[in-house]
Amino acid sequence: MTQVIQKNWQELIKPEKLQVTAGADPKRLATVVAEPLERGFGMTLGNSLRRILLSSLQGAAVTSVHIDGVLHEFSSIPGVREDVTDIILNIKDIAIKMQGDGPKRLVAKKNGPGVLVAGDIQTVGDIQILNPHLVLCTLDEGAELRMEFTVDTGKGYVPAERNRPEDAPIGLIPIDSLYSPVRKVSYKVENTREGQILDYDKLTMQIETDGSVSAEDALAYAARILQDQLEIFVNFEEPKRESETAAIQELPFNPALLKKVDELELSVRSANCLKNDNIVYIGDLIQKSETEMLRTPNFGRKSLNEIKEVLASMGLHLGMEVPGWPPENIEELAKRFEDHY
């Protein structure tokens, strides 16, 4: 394979990292920004990921319900203010997190007067009700109600007809199931700048889930699905960059140490302290002891803990010995291996 062919994908600009901003409810809402992208890629990726998020992620939902004394969904229940049709509509809104395989059966019981909520459902094992305050129905004085739910896992939308087993007993009411843990997805594409070029794409996606999976993780799963589906279209194996691989093996230290400390997203105070102490690379930083760091002007315990936490996430710590550091051609090496840290 020639270098000219490899340029088809190697020279396209792509984001170095995603910008993820949690919403008011961090477990359910997030805004994700990817930039810069080649012109047209914002729409291509945004539309593809949105479709996968809404249709292809696994989740859990109620597939059927049996209500004592009720034969079909058009019935009414003595002492219950809502009719069965309204109760079923409420049941569809139950958000469920289920780790294992289904189907599983859950039971809810209630004596009036009072309100039956999703939290009254008696869960088992790996099942969790995520919106326990959801009202299912209201019972008057003296009313009794018992419901048995069937919960299963799946993807996308499944109509009630497909949820009816062939040997369904009398009184079993199948329910439309929306398995997708993603409730809403929107995206927009704007122009963004990279250097002197003004017409790159900026993709912004707003994602809302039911809480069984975070918005950021849901996007990661959707991207993995897309990646997996596209693999079959690649009819070649890309040769490894032998020279770079050999060079990495020759380095006497981890190439991640060539990363500059100003790329660590530290607080302004911590970053300025490192800059004033002429600490440029991670390799410079990790050779410092905690005592040495605390001697740095304006550098306190809070900054120290912040740096220790960042280094720990990379498998590093202060006070390390690095043989062969600093290399003579450190700037050249840093640029050469920036894709490997």
Swiss-Prot record:
Enzyme type, top EC level: transferase
Keyword set, alphabetical order: DNA-directed RNA polymerase, Nucleotidyltransferase, Transcription, Transferase
InterPro entries on file: DNA-dir_RNA_pol_insert, DNA-dir_RNA_pol_RpoA/D/Rpb3, DNA-dir_RpoA, RBP11-like, RNAP_asu_C, RNApol_insert_sf
CDD domains associated with the record: RNAP_alpha_NTD
Reactions listed under catalytic activity: RNA(n) + a ribonucleoside 5'-triphosphate = RNA(n+1) + diphosphate
Organism superkingdom: Bacteria
GO cellular component, one term: cytoplasm
Region annotated Alpha C-terminal domain (alpha-CTD), chain positions: 253-341
A GO molecular-function annotation: protein dimerization activity
EC identifiers of the protein: 2.7.7.6
Pfam families found in the cross-reference section: RNA_pol_A_bac, RNA_pol_A_CTD, RNA_pol_L
Region called Alpha N-terminal domain (alpha-NTD), residue ranges: 1-237
A GO BP annotation: DNA-templated transcription
Comment text on domains: The N-terminal domain is essential for RNAP assembly and basal transcription, whereas the C-terminal domain is involved in interaction with transcriptional regulators and with upstream promoter elements.
Self-association and partners: Homodimer. The RNAP catalytic core consists of 2 alpha, 1 beta, 1 beta' and 1 omega subunit. When a sigma factor is associated with the core the holoenzyme is formed, which can initiate transcription.
Protein family per UniProt: Belongs to the RNA polymerase alpha chain family.
Role noted for this protein: DNA-dependent RNA polymerase catalyzes the transcription of DNA into RNA using the four ribonucleoside triphosphates as substrates.
Name of this chain's protein: DNA-directed RNA polymerase subunit alpha
Organism: Azorhizobium caulinodans (strain ATCC 43989 / DSM 5975 / JCM 20966 / LMG 6465 / NBRC 14845 / NCIMB 13405 / ORS 571)
